[in-house]
Each structure stands twice: as C-alpha cells, then as structure tokens.
Curated annotation (Swiss-Prot):
Protein family: Belongs to the FKBP-type PPIase family. Tig subfamily.
NCBIfam families reported for this sequence: tig
Annotated organism of origin: Chlorobaculum tepidum (strain ATCC 49652 / DSM 12025 / NBRC 103806 / TLS)
InterPro entries assigned: PPIase_dom_sf, Trig_fac, Trigger_fac_C, Trigger_fac_C_sf, Trigger_fac_ribosome-bd_bac, Trigger_fac_ribosome-bd_sf, Trigger_fact/SurA_dom_sf
Name this polypeptide is given: Trigger factor
Length: 426
C-alpha cells in the first residue's frame, strides 16, 4: 500500500491510497461471489451465471463497493499512523482500477494547527451585584402583581395603568373611516415604549377624554395613520398588602412569615445575579479569545453548529416554524454565529490538550455533590446514577471539561470586580 497526503489548505487535505491486487482482490472476489449467488439472470440458474457476464453487468457497482470498503479500512489506519485529526467524514473523490492497482483519492477536513496566544495580559471586569432592600421590594412588587386586582380609577392615566377606549381610524381630513371602529380596546401603558404615540397621547388623560393619535411611518415613503380614541375607563392595578397569610398562599406554605419570605427572595436574587455575573464574564472571555485567534473553521464543524442553532430556534417556537418560513435562509444567516461557536470549540480543545485536562469519575462525583446542595430533594447517589447513565454521561463530561477550561483561563488572566447595581426589570 502506498499513500500520498496533500495539504489543500489549513483545514483540508487529500489522501491518495494505492493498493496492489493482493490487497484489494480478496474483497473484490468476495463481493463477486456473493453477487453470483444472489443475482438472477434469465436463462441461467441462480448461482450459475458466468463470471465474465456477471462482471459486465454488475462489475461497476462491485468496484464502487470495494473502493468504499478499502477507503474506510485504510483511511482509519493511515489517520492513526499519520496523526491526522479529521474534522469531517472522508469523501471519495475518485477511484481507478488500472494495471492491477486500485487508486483511491479521498478528501476530508482537518482541525487546523495553531498556537495559543499568551493571554496572561488580558484583563476583564466582572460585575459584582449586591442585593439591596429596594431590589427585594421591587421583586416582591412584581410577585404581588399576580395577586392584584384591577380597579377603576378616577385619576389621570399613569404608567402601569390600563386605558380602555373605542378606537376609530381617521382619514386624511380627520373624518371617521366607516367600519374601522374597534370598541373597548385595552392599552396597557406599562408595556408600551415611552415614545409610543398611543402611550404619549393617553398618559395624563381620564375617562371621558377624547384624544387623536398620529402614527408616523417607520420607513420613508410609508403611510401615516391617524386614530381617535374615546376613553371609557382607566384601570389601576391595586396590589394587596404583603402579610403572613398572603406569604403562606404565595409560597404554598413554604414560608409563614414575611421576613422569611423576604430573605428567600434576597437569596434567589443573589443566586440569579451571581450566575449572571459569571455567565457574562465567561462570554467576555470567550469573545476575547475568539477575537485574538482568527482560526480557520472547517465547514463541516460550522454546518454542525448551524444545525444546532436552527433546531434551537425551532424548539423556541413550539418545534415547528410557521408556514412560509425560509429555513434555508435562516440556516445561512446563522453562519457567522456558527463560525464563532466552531472557533471557540477549536480554541477550548487546544487549551484542554495543552493543559492535559480530562474528566474522571471523581470529578463527576464532585459535580453531583455540588448540584445536590442546590436541589435538596435529590441525593448525591441519585444524581450520580443519572450523570453516569448512557444518556447523560457525555453531556456531564462536556460540562465539567468546560468548567476546567475556563478555570485555567481565569487563573491566568486578570479579573477586576466592579460594584454594579441590579438592573430594573418588569
């Protein structure tokens, strides 16, 4: 067997394998014999078709099958011997039987060779959130909204109120357009942007007022729309007082006292924003390393991440895109993002290799112990059995390895903590 490896690019190679008849003929003869036993040709008993006729009829398909099997057999051995690191399935580009030899040409993508930059000089800022009483109050207010009551208000509409009115579309002269009236339309001012023309027109108005609203086109050359709103009612969300009885109801008897409930809210907020702080830091780290290592990405790897992003988007809309949605266009639009994912995978694999990182069963046990502290209803043994199962083990190993990779990076870069206020949210 002879082999010739040609570098096509940083991420692509071609392999030429030349086999002697002694190396491929046994497989060819076996395929021919199996075909002779099964092929039916009119005028001949099954299994008694002359070999010459059989070669003329199905010879090309046998040659293709033999080339496929020989390529698979020898590529695996050559890849191990030459330390080839394929990034895609090998494809047969051509094969040729001539002068007692079988020549097979194979193409495939490889992981690129590159050097990691010294990232010890990199600096990152990590948000450090401190939960204040005001943050707890704001979170509790959001919870109480689910237990509030909408009541009619005589006051002028303010942020957070709901305005109910009849809406009529107007023509360019300000006259009602027949059939355009929409009765009892609800405007929840809280969820309208501050610059929304309806919110701007309705805030400060009371029941009985009539307001005209002009909605200008977002794009040049678009149509300007005009509406008249006859306000019939302003409703305000009245929140209940937080007391021990309501705490029992809200927490489903987990807590009996307001103080205990508030403390739990504080702990939840602290855990949430600690996770957010860590997530944002890791995102900043990966973005920096991707930027500093413009590594070429194998197309098969990029396509893999494009498919993942496509399936994730599909799950977010219930498992099926709406009718008329162009999946191919979306797939192509995901390519830049997929390239970043592929590049980060190559970089993180390089870090793991250079630092001899691996995941042991002891690592998985330690991970189970840590997770059990977060979920008291599950024991370490229960989690460990799940993590070591066929369905979950690869995922858990990948998760732990990622943690180790980031730990290596964090140990070498400079991370500065920065006091950061908790962002308001609705």
């Amino acid at each position: 067997m002879q082999k010739n490896i040609t570098n096509v690019s940083e991420i692509a190679q071609e392999l030429e394998i030349i086999l002697t008849a002694e190396e491929y003929q046994p497989e060819y003869d076996q395929q021919l014999e199996e075909a002779r036993k099964s092929v039916r040709i009119k005028g001949f008993r099954q299994g008694h078709v002359p070999v010459g006729m059989l070669k003329r009829i199905i010879g090309p398909s046998i040659e293709a099958e033999v080339a496929e099997k020989m390529a698979s057999k020898y590529f695996a051995a050559i890849a191990e011997e030459e330390k080839i690191n394929p990034a895609s399935r090998a494809q047969i580009e051509s094969y040729n039987y001539e002068d007692g030899k079988l020549t097979i040409k194979i193409s495939y993508e490889i992981h690129p060779e590159f050097e990691l930059k010294d990232f010890s000089e990199y600096t990152f800022t990590q948000a450090e959130y401190t939960i204040s009483d005001e943050d707890v109050d704001r979170e509790i207010k959001l919870i109480l909204r689910g237990h509030g009551t909408m009541v009619t208000s005589e006051d002028a509409a303010a942020e957070g109120d709901t305005v109910i009115g009849d809406v009529t579309k107007l023509d360019a002269d300000g006259a009602d357009i027949e059939g355009s009236k929409n009765e009892n339309h609800h405007f929840n001012l809280e969820y309208l942007p501050a610059d929304n023309p309806f919110r701007m027109a309705l805030e400060g108005k009371k029941a009985g007022d009539v307001v005209d609203v002009t909605v200008k086109p977002k794009e040049e050359g678009g149509e300007t729309n005009r509406f008249r709103i006859e306000i019939k009612e302003v409703k305000h969300l009245e929140l209940p007082e937080l007391d021990d009885e309501l705490v029992k109801e809200i927490s489903q008897q987990r807590f009996e006292k307001v103080e205990d409930f508030r403390n739990d809210i504080r702990l939840q907020l602290q855990a949430h924003f600690s996770d957010k702080s860590e997530y944002d830091l890791l995102e900043a780290i990966s973005s920096k390393l991707i930027e500093e290592h413009p590594v070429p990405t194998p197309s098969a790897m990029v396509a893999h991440f494009q498919n993942i992003l496509l399936e994730n988007a599909k799950r977010q809309v219930g498992g099926q895109f709406p009718k008329g949605f162009d999946e191919r266009e979306f797939f192509n639009a995901m390519k830049p993002n997929a390239e970043k994912h592929a590049r980060w995978l190559l970089i993180s694999q390089k870090i793991a290799k250079e630092n001899n990182l691996e995941v042991t069963d002891e690592d998985i046990k330690a991970f189970a112990e840590k997770e059990a502290e977060k979920e008291p209803s599950l024991t370490v043994d229960q989690l460990l059995n799940t993590y070591l199962s066929t369905e979950f083990k690869d995922y858990i190993i990948d998760t732990i390895l990622k943690e180790k990779i980031y730990d290596v990076i964090k140990s070498k870069v400079t991370i500065t903590k920065e006091a950061t206020p908790v962002p308001a949210h609705n």
